[in-house]
Amino acid sequence: MTTPTAIRRLDAADPDFARHLDHLLSWESVSDDSVNQRVLDIIKAVRERGDAALVEFTQKFDGLQVASMADLILPRERLELALTRITPGQREALEKAAERVRSYHEKQKQDSWSYTEADGTVLGQKVTPLDRAGLYVPGGKASYPSSVLMNAIPAKVAGVTEVVMVVPTPRGEINELVLAAACIAGVDRVFTIGGAQAVAALAYGTESVPKVDKVVGPGNIYVATAKRHVFGQVGIDMIAGPSEILVVCDGQTDPDWIAMDLFSQAEHDEDAQAILVSPDAEFLDKVAASITRLLPTMERAAIVETSINGRGALIKVADMAQAIEVANRIAPEHLELSVADPEAWLPQIRHAGAIFMGRHTSEALGDYCAGPNHVLPTSGTARFSSPLGVYDFQKRSSIIYCSPQGASELGKTASVLARGESLSGHARSAEYRITDPDWTAGNKEDGK
């Protein structure tokens, strides 16, 4: 007999619901002192010894015998070879996904703009791509080619000159799909290094690894901690927490569909979070039964069970309006609106990384091939953060061109404000350009 699921049940009508929800959502992401110190030691070694440190750490952590950095560089020809080593079906899927991701992200491109004022002053904004971006890809047989597409393609669409990928190959394990994805996405250089040492190499550069402007991509606690420490030296995408899915359902979707949607995130790792919110108590019972029945069929059943029972929940609400309130409170990475009329509720959704509309739009489609990016804010950071996109690989510069007349008029305002802040150098710099003799005579000060 199958043991019923032990997934947590919450009711928004409970006076202690807010406290229980806060406890459900809590997750400690801060590295412990030992991890922090190890990462700092690794970063220091890479900064001081460059390639030699990378070779040493690769031998130590990845179990590889390499003589030099030359053994840790994959040429373009090796990426092209990977395309021939995957199945035709896999290549077709990668190419189709890449095409859709590229098409979606093309629409995110920002253009420079300017306008001219009556006196000839020109104001504007110049959009410039980063020179070089670093992409971290987890290694081994469990690595994810979809992450290569989602990180590299927006960078190339943005116009980044060079995309540098690092991917460890523990015990020599190479994922041909990852290399094929890198080839299709247009990755320029690949180094088979990983961990905190790879992040340090990208941030500071070595004899072989070029210094980049931004580091993106997922990784373990050492990678995440290293990204925290190098932030400021380089930009980073985000410090991602465990994967999350929140399903809001009106009770009319097939319970098996919902259970499997919850599993789709729970199978990532034991800390992943899968939550269902519905006003239909009977439907919640049906989904619980589906979870119990389907769980033994999962390849990663142990991981799914730990995640579902440890951090998952079925939440009963009074109505759909309250379901949306709960969704906004959670600010999930992935939000499925599995309802009859998702468009009606969309305007009320304020906080979510990605919103999946309707019963047929499973989160898995967005993970792989719908087009929008699957690198999304987690741990409630959707309240102030956005999905990875082209804009993460572009920067903006303000453009100011003052005509003589414009400089004279703006100088008057700048002078008053600068002297109000007791910054006479600022004031006099502006005043030198004022051509109005009446203003100059009336505002002459000692030392001017």
From Swiss-Prot:
Domain of life: Bacteria
One GO cellular component term noted in the UniProt record for this chain: cytosol
Residues annotated to bind Zn(2+): Q265, H268, D367, H426
PROSITE patterns, alphabetized: HISOL_DEHYDROGENASE
Residues the record marks as active site: E333, H334
GO biological process terms, semicolon-separated: L-histidine biosynthetic process
Binding residues annotated for substrate, in chain numbering: S243, Q265, H268, H334, D367, E421, H426
Residues annotated to bind NAD(+): Y136, Q197, N220
Entry cofactors: Zn(2+)
InterPro entries reported in the protein's UniProt record: Ald_DH/histidinol_DH, Histidinol_DH_CS, Histidinol_DH_monofunct, Hstdl_DH
Catalytic reaction annotation: L-histidinol + 2 NAD(+) + H2O = L-histidine + 2 NADH + 3 H(+)
Documented EC number(s): 1.1.1.23
Top enzyme category: oxidoreductase
Note on cofactor: Binds 1 zinc ion per subunit.
Matches recorded under NCBIfam families: hisD (TIGR00069)
Protein family: Belongs to the histidinol dehydrogenase family.
General function of this protein: Catalyzes the sequential NAD-dependent oxidations of L-histidinol to L-histidinaldehyde and then to L-histidine.
Name this protein carries in UniProt: Histidinol dehydrogenase
Originating species: Pseudomonas syringae pv. syringae (strain B728a)
The gene coding this protein: hisD
